[in-house]
Amino acid sequence: MGSNNVFIKSVTKMFDNAIQTLGVEKGLANQIKSCNSTHTIRFGVKLTDGIKVFTGWRAVHSEHLEPVKGGIRYSPAVSASEVEAMAMLMTFKNAVIDVPFGGSKGGLKINPSKYSEEDLEKITRRFTEELVKRGLISPSLNVPAPDMGTGKKEMAWIADEYKRLNPHDINAYACVTGKPENMGGVDGRTEATGRGIFFALNSFFNSSDLKKTKIKGNLKSQKIIIEGLGKVGYFAAKALRDHGATIIGIIEKDQSFYNPKGLDIDLIRTWLNESSEAKDYPNQKELFSKDEVFSAACDIFIPAATEGTITEDNFHLLNTKLICEGANGPLTSRADQFLNDKGVLIIPDLYANAGGVAVSYFEWVRNLQHMRFGRMEKRRKEYENASLLSVIETSTGSKISSQTKNLLNQGPSEIDLVRSGLEDMMTEAYENMSEIWNENKYDSLRTTAYIYSIKKLIESYRNIGI
């Protein structure tokens, strides 16, 4: 994994390239680039084995729109510079898919696997308390979400602690997204980033930009290798497999898998969660080293693990026509340039993995409305469909089966609505980027995505007199 300094340098370099291409005045460019504030938080917690002091960060990159939005990462490797780079990326990611948030990110230096659930809850609640003290979490100012090392459980603790500290805030549960459904979370948030990758690829394959690659056929006919089978990688693999694509390779830290005819991703995920002992894996012929799978031929490579996994030292090993960035910053800036020169098209992270914040936006809106999606329309839709079916039966003289009637009458579920909204946001964002790319002949889709988002920030800053 690349160092934190390499990560922030890479994000900054990619931003600088876009700014230079756009020709933005230096002072305004520095305003857009600068991280507005980074808060270092140290706090002690009394655990089962004594008092321990933890260090966390919350960076706010841009408040051109509020609240600011970005996840909280639990990792022993997290640092202030990493959090700042991710906050910067969040600003542009939010702008690309047109959600009304500025960019923020948080991190806690901790290995969560080393602590009991009871201790982890204490740590999370204390961290939340420190964030609340500093105005770094609230429905109107700063709204965290899950990231590496965190999930629904941690978000539930954060939401509950915020509500305990702010008992009169009717919108308290909107202080964080990615919560369990019974606390105001939405069905589909866990899969959102991975499914968003599928929608990003589908949008690309449905565009004329496909002609810019050496890829033949539609998305269903592609062979795909995915680096990282965590939440992002698994749900991307699942959506792509269900669409008809073939997942031929999975790269994990300690063990990788390859089968040119396709892998059983559910089997692999279960094995990774339950055993991870090579001798226990049932299909021994599918076990390979990381380097062997990394360099295997494929149509699409999806790095979905962590930042800096593709560098100037290993980019030449890749044998792919297209890269879709599932992780934040998986390519260093030099690797990005080398691969572009090599003719490999890259769908960048600030667009490709924006599905998570898109669905977080839906959850935040739902929490403010205090009403589940579809509540006002469900019965009306059922009556409309029933009337339509009756007209069809009368006009054709044919009876429609009960199964078909039930399917049409039940209407869309919450996850149907969430997926529909996510697909619309990802499709519209790609169409807008593609139009700009083809009109201006920018050097890459990444540069185009940055320029597209930077233009929105420029407009926001000009509106407030900067």
Q: Where would I find each of the regions flagged by the language model?
A:
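Conserved active-site and cofactor/substrate-binding residues in soluble primary-metabolism enzymes
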Residues: 6, 10-13, 36, 78-81, ...
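Glycine-rich, N-terminal phosphate-binding loop and its surrounding beta-alpha-beta segment
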Residues: 40-114
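Glycine-rich phosphate/diphosphate-binding loop of Rossmann-like nucleotide-binding domains
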Residues: 184-295
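Adenosine-phosphate binding glycine-rich loop
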Residues: 2-6, 204-205, 321-466
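Short, Gly/Pro- and small/polar-rich lid/capping loops
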Residues: 2-42
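Glycine/serine-rich phosphate-binding loop and adjoining beta1-alpha1 elements at the start
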Residues: 75, 94-220
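Rossmann-like adenosine-cofactor binding region
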Residues: 255-346
